[in-house]
């Protein structure tokens, strides 16, 4: 039965291995910026496109693999769609064997694009059915602090701090801002009440 659905043992499977790692992110840590729809779909499509191009133009598979993964990371970073399993997508495009090589740029759309889209739709359905917000949106506190107790960090100041930090962190800017404001509010309450924990 599986042979009828999948085709012969030599045919390209409808699912590629990097999608297992994508599934871990989408279902296990759906709030991560690395697991958002743009990250999985954009990251995987970009990586597949770069991987196929590297495989086509670079004769050495080892060099093509290194170029594909490195270039995919650079482009994903610039497009703000970093998705770690996409590195494996780029690698699969280069080292996946004759069936994947025969697909050429078709590999970008099927299986990569199709797998990414179906996995994202599945994550939306599952996470929202189980009460988890996906795609993730920053939490807004239910009881904002009164104006007198609030300390502020402007969006520009937060952007400056993140730029000075110089590294990518696995939390969205909006979530970080909400957490920071919550921490400032609690610190202010401790100051006003004289309570130190």
Where are these regions (language model features)?
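Short, surface-exposed acidic
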Residues: 169-176
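Alpha-helical transmembrane segments and their membrane-interface boundaries
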Residues: 1-50, 59-66, 104-109, 113, ...
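Hydrophobic alpha-helical transmembrane segments and immediately flanking/interface helices
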Residues: 85, 176-197
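Anion-binding (especially nucleotide phosphate/pyrophosphate-binding) glycine-rich loop
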Residues: 60, 71, 75
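Membrane-helix interface "capping/anchor" motifs
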Residues: 30-39, 76-87
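Generic transmembrane alpha-helix signature in multi-pass membrane proteins
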Residues: 24-26, 51-55, 76, 90-95
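Transmembrane helix-loop junctions at the membrane interface of multipass transporters and ion channels
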Residues: 90-107
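Subset of alpha-helical transmembrane segments and adjacent helix-loop junctions
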Residues: 56-67, 82-89
């Amino acid at each position: 039965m599986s042979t009828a659905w999948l085709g012969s043992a030599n045919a390209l499977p409808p699912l590629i291995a990097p999608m297992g790692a994508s599934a871990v992110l989408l279902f296990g840590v759906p709030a991560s910026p690395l697991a958002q729809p743009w990250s999985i779909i954009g990251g995987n499509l970009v990586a597949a496109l770069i991987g196929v191009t590297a495989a086509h133009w670079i004769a050495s598979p080892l060099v093509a693999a290194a170029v594909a993964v490195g270039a995919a990371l650079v482009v994903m970073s610039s497009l703000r769609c970093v998705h770690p399993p996409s590195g494996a997508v780029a690698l699969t495009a280069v080292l996946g064997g004759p069936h994947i090589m025969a697909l050429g740029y078709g590999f970008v759309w099927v299986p990569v694009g199709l797998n990414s889209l179906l996995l994202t739709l599945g994550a939306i359905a599952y996470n929202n059915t189980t009460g988890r917000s996906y795609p993730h949106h920053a939490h807004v506190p239910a009881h904002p602090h009164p104006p007198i107790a609030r300390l502020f960090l402007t969006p520009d100041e937060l952007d400056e701090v993140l730029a000075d930090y110089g590294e990518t962190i696995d939390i969205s800017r909006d979530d970080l801002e909400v957490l920071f404001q919550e921490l400032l509010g609690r610190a202010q309450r401790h100051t006003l009440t004289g309570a130190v924990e």
